[in-house]
Amino acid sequence: MRLMTKLGFRALVASCLIAAGAAANAQVNVLITGVGSTQFPIATANFANEAGLPQQVTSIVRADLARSGKFTNIDAGSTPVPETASVDLGAWKAKGANAFVAGSVNREANGQYKVNFILYDTVKQQSLGGLSLTATDTTLRTAGHKIADYIYQKLLGVRGVFATRLSYVIKTGNRYQLQISDSDGQNARIALSSTEPIISPAWSPSGTKVAYVSFERKKPIVYIHDLPTGRRYMVSDQKGNNSAPAWSPDSNTLAVALSLTGNTQIYTVNANGGGLRRLTQSSSIDTEPYYSPDGRWIYFTSDRGGAPQIYRMPAQGESAGAAQRVTFTGSYNTSPRISPDGKLLAYISRTGGGFKLYVQDLQTGAANAITNTNRDESPSFAANGQYLLYATQSGGRNVLAAVPSDGSAPPQILSVQGGSVREPSWGPFMQ
C-alpha cells in the first residue's frame, strides 16, 4: 500500500493502511504487450473436436501467448490439426512460424475430456514433445493455460505463469469483494464480499490459501481463506491493528504487523493462530513484513531512521541480529517484495510528488523506476519473476497494471468493468 508523509505514514499504519464461492460479474482483463524488441512467431492450429465445447482450448492458448508479450501468433487457418496428423513443418516455417502446435480435445465415456497436443520446432524440423491432460467442463481453461505454460518453457527456457492465479479487491459502490481469478483475469470467483474494507491479500506458497485483512468487525483482523474448501478462519485478532500478513516459505507461519503494545511492530504467528512472537523491538513504526524465498530474512518497512525505508532482519527477529537498511535510493520507500529467485527487491518510492514502482538488484544495490505511472502501490512478482503486477491510478480510477520486472517495456493497464480494483497479489506456481 502507498504511504504518504511521515505523519501520514504513522496515521495510515495506525488505521491499518485503509484503502481500499459465487461467480464474479466484474472481470479483470490482463494484457502485457510489447515486451522486448522481438517476439517469437508461433502458429497454433485449431484443436480437433473443439466444436460445441464450453471452452475453446485453442483460443485460450493463443490468448495466453499473445498477452505475454513474448509471442506473435501466426495465422494458422481454420482447419483443425490433431496431434496425430503428419505436419509439413517446412510449409509452416515458410509462413513465418518458428514453432507449430497441433492438438485435439476428445470426450471420454466418463464425461471428462482428454486434451492432447504436440509442439514442433519448425526451424530444426523436430518435435519438442507435448502433454496429455485430463479435464472437465470447468477445467478446460486450466488445460489451455498448462499447454501455454509448456510452450513458454520449451521455447523460452523459463517456466510460464499462465496456470497461476491472481487475487485482488474490487470496490463497487459501497461493497468490497476479494476475488480470485485465473492469471488472465477470467474465471473470477468471489472469496469474500463485505461493506467494510478488505486489504492485503497474500497467497500461501502452496497456492491453496489466501491470508487477508478484513474490517467486517469494525477493526482490522487477519483471516486465512482455504480455497479448496471455501472455509476461512481467524489468525490474528490482537488488541489494536492486525495487518500486513506475509507467509513463510514453508506455509507454517505468518509474519504480521500488530500495534499490540502501541507502535506497530513485526510479529510472527502460526498459521493456525497460535504461537504469537514479537520480532522487532523498536520505538518506531515497523510494518509490511515479507519473507525472502529461502526463509532466512524478513524485509520490512520502518521509519526508525526518520522516514520510511526498507530494512531486513533475520527471520528469527532482531534478537538474532540487528536489522539492516536495504534501500538508499530515494528518501521514502515502502512495500517491499522479493522476487522468487531472491535477487530483486520491488518497492514503492516517493518520487517527484508521486509514487513509483522501483526494482533494486539486491547484490549491487542498483535501483531503477520501471513504470511511467505515478500513483503506484502494492507490487507483486509473478511466480517466474518475469513480471510485476501492481495497483495504480489511470483516468481517475484505481486500476491494476503489469510490467516486465526488468523494465524492458512500459506497463499495461488492466481493465475491470464497473468498479475500482487494487490490492493485487500474484499466486505461486500450482502444484
UniProtKB/Swiss-Prot annotation:
It comes from the Bacteria. InterPro entries: 6-blade_b-propeller_TolB-like, PD40, Tol-Pal_TolB, TolB_N. GO terms for biological process: cell division; protein import. SUPFAM superfamilies: TolB, N-terminal domain, Tricorn protease N-terminal domain. Residues 1-26 form the signal peptide. It is found in: Periplasm. Pfam families: PD40, TolB_N. The keyword Acyltransferase does not apply. Its main location: periplasm. Disulfide bonds: none annotated. GO terms for cellular component: periplasmic space. Keywords: Cell cycle, Cell division, Periplasm, Signal. Belongs to the TolB family. The Tol-Pal system is composed of five core proteins: the inner membrane proteins TolA, TolQ and TolR, the periplasmic protein TolB and the outer membrane protein Pal. They form a network linking the inner and outer membranes and the peptidoglycan layer. Part of the Tol-Pal system, which plays a role in outer membrane invagination during cell division and is important for maintaining outer membrane integrity. HAMAP family: TolB. This is Tol-Pal system protein TolB. It comes from Burkholderia ambifaria (strain ATCC BAA-244 / DSM 16087 / CCUG 44356 / LMG 19182 / AMMD).
